[in-house]
C-alpha cells in the first residue's frame, strides 16, 4: 500500500507547471516548447512509474486511494483512486498529450497561452479519469471545456468561431443534465448529502428516479461520445481545429464520454442500464451505418475522418450495451485503439492540409509522388482504422462482435440482425477510407500550386507517427497488453448484473 499522493501530483503538476510558462524569459518560442514537452514527459514517466510499482493488476478494488477534506461546510472531499478501468485511459492521455505537444511545434502565435491550455486540458483529463467523487468528476468534466473552446476559437480555420460556439453550446447543454443528475444522486435518500462513488455504488433508487438519472447522464455522454443525433458539433470542430487540438479531441475527449458511461451509468445505475441496454445496442448499430454512409458523402477529408470517428464510437456503445464480460472488454479495447488511430489520422490530415492549403478531395490527387512518407503512414493508419487483422482496430471490433453474440440478454434473431448491420458498417469503412486515399494520393493531377514548396514529413513528424504505430501493432498482435488491465475489474462490475 502506497501512502504517497501519486494521483494528486499527477493531477496538479501539469496545470501548476503550465501556469509558470508565463514567467519564462521572452527569448522566442524555443524555451516554451522545450519546457512544455519536458513537463509532459515528466508527467508521463511519473504515471508509468506509479502504475508499474504501486498498482496491483489482480486487485479489482480501487487503488492508490486519496481522500482529503476540501470544502468542509459542504462535506466536499478531494477523492482520487484508480482501478483497471481508468489505468488504460490515464496512460493513453499521457501518451497522446505528450505527442500532441510535440505536434504543436509549428505554433508560434501566442504560443505561451497555447501550451498552457494544453497542459490545463492534461490536468482535467487525468483528474476526470482518477476521480472517486461525483462532484469532483463533474468539475473535471467542466474544466475541460474552457481550454478546448479557447484552443478552437484562437487557433483554428476560417470558421473557427462558429465551430467553437457550436462545441460549447452542445457540451454546456449536456452538462446541465449532468449537473441535475449529480445533485439528484447526492441529495436522494440520506440525511447527509454525499457524492462518494464508494457509497453511491450501494445506493438503490426507485425505478422511475433511476431511469431519469440515467437519462440525464446519458445526454451529457451522448454529446461527448458523440451518439447520434447529438454528434453534429464533431465534424465542424475537427474540420476547423489545429491538428494538435484534433489529436486531443479525437484521442481523449471522446473517450471521456465512454468512460463516464461505464463508470457512472453502468456501475451506479445497474437496473436502468439493464433496461436501456437494448436501446444502446440499437443506437450503436444505427450509428455505425449512418456515420459510415455520411462519411462517404463528405468532400472535406478532415470531415470524412471525423465521421469515421463517429462510426467507430458505435462499437464502443454496442460493447457497453451488450453487458457481457467480452463485450465490455472489447469496448475498453476500442476506446484505447481508436484513441491511437483517430489521433494519428487527424495529425496526418492536418500536416497534409498545412502543406497543400487544400482540404477538398476533388482538388487533390497525385500527392503520393511529392510526399511518399505521408502517403505510407496515411495508408497504414487507414488500414488500422478499417480493422486490418494484425492491428488494434481489428481485435477491438472482433471482441465487441463476440461480446454481442454471447450476450444472454438478447434473443437470437435481434443478435443476428444487429451483427448483420455491424457487418455492413465494417464493409462501408474500407469504401470511404480507400476512396479518400485514392482521391488524395493516386492519379497524376498535380494541382495549380507550384509543387516546389512541398516537403515530405520531417524527423519530428515521423517520430510521432512511429511512436503511435508501435502500440497499434502491439495491441493488434497481443491484445492482452490492454485486456489484462481491465479484465478483473470488468468481472467485478458485471457481478451486479448476473449475481453468481
Swiss-Prot record:
MF GO annotations: NADH dehydrogenase (ubiquinone) activity; ubiquinone binding
GO cellular component: chloroplast thylakoid membrane
Domain of life of the native organism: Eukaryota
Topology versus the membrane: Multi-pass membrane protein
Main location: plastid
Family named by the database record: Belongs to the complex I subunit 4 family.
Coiled coil: none
Pfam family membership, one: Proton_antipo_M
Protein name in UniProt: NAD(P)H-quinone oxidoreductase chain 4, chloroplastic
Location in the cell: Plastid, Chloroplast thylakoid membrane
Gene (UniProt): ndhD
GO BP of this protein: ATP synthesis coupled electron transport; electron transport coupled proton transport
Amino acid at each position: 500500500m502506497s501512502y504517497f499522493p501519486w494521483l494528486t501530483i499527477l493531477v496538479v503538476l501539469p496545470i501548476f507547471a503550465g501556469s509558470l510558462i508565463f514567467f519564462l524569459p521572452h527569448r522566442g518560442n524555443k524555451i516554451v516548447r522545450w519546457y512544455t514537452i519536458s513537463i509532459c514527459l515528466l508527467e508521463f514517466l511519473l504515471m508509468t512509474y506509479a502504475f508499474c510499482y504501486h498498482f496491483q493488476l489482480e486487485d479489482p478494488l480501487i487503488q492508490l486511494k486519496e481522500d482529503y477534506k476540501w470544502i468542509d461546510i459542504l462535506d466536499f472531499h478531494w477523492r482520487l483512486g484508480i482501478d483497471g478501468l481508468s489505468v488504460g485511459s490515464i496512460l493513453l492521455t499521457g501518451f497522446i498529450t505528450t505527442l500532441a505537444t510535440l505536434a504543436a511545434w509549428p505554433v508560434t502565435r501566442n504560443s505561451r497561452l497555447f501550451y498552457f491550455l494544453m497542459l490545463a486540458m492534461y490536468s482535467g483529463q487525468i483528474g476526470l479519469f482518477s476521480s472517486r467523487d461525483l462532484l469532483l468528476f463533474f468539475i473535471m468534466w467542466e474544466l475541460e471545456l474552457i481550454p478546448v473552446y479557447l484552443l478552437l476559437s484562437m487557433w483554428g480555420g476560417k470558421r473557427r468561431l462558429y465551430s467553437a460556439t457550436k462545441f460549447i453550446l452542445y457540451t454546456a447543454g449536456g452538462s446541465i443534465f449532468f449537473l441535475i443528475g449529480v445533485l439528484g444522486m447526492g441529495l436522494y435518500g440520506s440525511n447527509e448529502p454525499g457524492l462518494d462513488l464508494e457509497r453511491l455504488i450501494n445506493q438503490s433508487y426507485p425505478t422511475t428516479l433511476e431511469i431519469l438519472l440515467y437519462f440525464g447522464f446519458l445526454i451529457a455522454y451522448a454529446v461527448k461520445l458523440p451518439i447520434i443525433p447529438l454528434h453534429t458539433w464533431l465534424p465542424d470542430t475537427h474540420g476547423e481545429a489545429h491538428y494538435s487540438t484534433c489529436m486531443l479531441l479525437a484521442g481523449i475527449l471522446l473517450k471521456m464520454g465512454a468512460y463516464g458511461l461505464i463508470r457512472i451509468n453502468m456501475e451506479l445505475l445497474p437496473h436502468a442500464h439493464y433496461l436501456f441496454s437494448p436501446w444502446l445496442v440499437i443506437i450503436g448499430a444505427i450509428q455505425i451505418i449512418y456515420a459510415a454512409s455520411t462519411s462517404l458523402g463528405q468532400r472535406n477529408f478532415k470531415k470524412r475522418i471525423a465521421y469515421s470517428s463517429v462510426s467507430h464510437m458505435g462499437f464502443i456503445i454496442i460493447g457497453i450495451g451488450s453487458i457481457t464480460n467480452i463485450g465490455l472488454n472489447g469496448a475498453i479495447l476500442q476506446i484505447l485503439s481508436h484513441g491511437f488511430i483517430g489521433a494519428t489520422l487527424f495529425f496526418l490530415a492536418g500536416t497534409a492540409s498545412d502543406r497543400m492549403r487544400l482540404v477538398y478531395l476533388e482538388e487533390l490527387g497525385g500527392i503520393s509522388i511529392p510526399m511518399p512518407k505521408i502517403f505510407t503512414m496515411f495508408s497504414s493508419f487507414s488500414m488500422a482504422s478499417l480493422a486490418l487483422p494484425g492491428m488494434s482496430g481489428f481485435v477491438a471490433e472482433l471482441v465487441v462482435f463476440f461480446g454481442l453474440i454471447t450476450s444472454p440478454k438478447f434473443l437470437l434473431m435481434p443478435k443476428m440482425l444487429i451483427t448483420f448491420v455491424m457487418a455492413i458498417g465494417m464493409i462501408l469503412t474500407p469504401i470511404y477510407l480507400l476512396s479518400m486515399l485514392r482521391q488524395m494520393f493516386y492519379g497524376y493531377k498535380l494541382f495549380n500550386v507550384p509543387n516546389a514548396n512541398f516537403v515530405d514529413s520531417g524527423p519530428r513528424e515521423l517520430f510521432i507517427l512511429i511512436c503511435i504505430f508501435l502500440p497499434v501493432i502491439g495491441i493488434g498482435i497481443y491484445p492482452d497488453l490492454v485486456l489484462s488491465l481491465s479484465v478483473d475489474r470488468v468481472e467485478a462490475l458485471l457481478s451486479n448484473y448476473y449475481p453468481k
